[in-house]
A protein has these predicted regions:
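Conserved redox-active cysteine motifs that mediate thiol-disulfide chemistry
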Residues: 75, 83-100
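N-terminal targeting signals for export/organelle localization
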Residues: 1-55, 180
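Hydrophobic beta-strand core positions in alpha/beta domains
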Residues: 80-82, 112, 157
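Thiol/disulfide oxidoreductase modules built on the thioredoxin-like
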Residues: 124-132, 138-184
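Structural microenvironment flanking redox-active thiols in thiol-disulfide oxidoreductases
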Residues: 92-129, 139-146
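Short pre-active-site segment immediately N-terminal to redox-active cysteine/selenocysteine motifs
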Residues: 77-79, 84-87, 151, 161
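A short beta-strand-turn-helix
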Residues: 50-53, 58-79, 103
């Protein structure tokens, strides 16, 4: 396993209103190119132990235009959640391949979760890497804590039934990423 970056940076918190929900049929096209803020319901805040076969925990993404995406709305589609940071060299190394996969597979939902950084630095990174997928702002580290993420990059692969199929801590090579995505398609 490649080394992962320590997740110890901090940033300000943010939350949003409850508004119109998104339908899974609208994804990933309508979900992309936004910077939703992560929110974890109080009843779901207990960290999980990452293991294959366990259910993915509940979380919500709140977009700046008021749209809300609940993690349960992702059922029916394969999902990759990638935890990363702009200051993390291994995250930079793997991002081009993740973006390539997001562009190549319209059925795959990729959520790029930035941990504890501000919007402007994240926006610059997203533009530099041509990130077409949603770049989730986990400014308080709620999703990081919920998924028990210890270092970055870490990728979680969730099947269409909402179960964690696998996860990887460290840089994913193109062949490793292909293999893990094959398991959830």
């Amino acid at each position: 396993v490649s080394p992962a970056c320590s997740a110890s940076h901090t940033a300000s918190s943010s939350s949003g209103p409850e508004a119109g929900k998104m339908a899974v049929a609208d994804m990933p096209q309508d979900i992309g190119r936004g910077f939703p803020v992560a929110s974890v319901p109080e009843e779901s805040q207990r960290p999980i132990t990452l293991k294959a076969g366990s259910s993915s925990p509940q979380f919500t993404l709140i977009f700046s235009d008021g749209r809300i995406l609940d993690s349960s709305d992702l059922r029916g589609r394969p999902v990759m959640i990638n935890f990363w940071a702009t200051w993390c060299p291994p995250c930079r190394d793997e991002m081009p391949e993740i973006v390539r996969q997001a562009k190549a597979d319209e059925d795959l939902i990729v959520l790029a979760v930035n941990v504890r950084e501000g919007l402007e630095i994240v926006r610059t990174f997203a533009e530099e890497y041509d990130m077409i997928m949603p770049v989730v702002l986990d400014q308080r580290g709620d999703l990081q804590n919920l998924f028990s993420i210890r270092g970055m990059p870490t990728s979680i692969f969730i099947d269409s039934e909402g179960s964690i199929a696998s996860y990887w801590e460290g840089v994913l090579s193109a062949s490793q990423l292909d293999s893990m995505l094959t398991d959830i398609r």
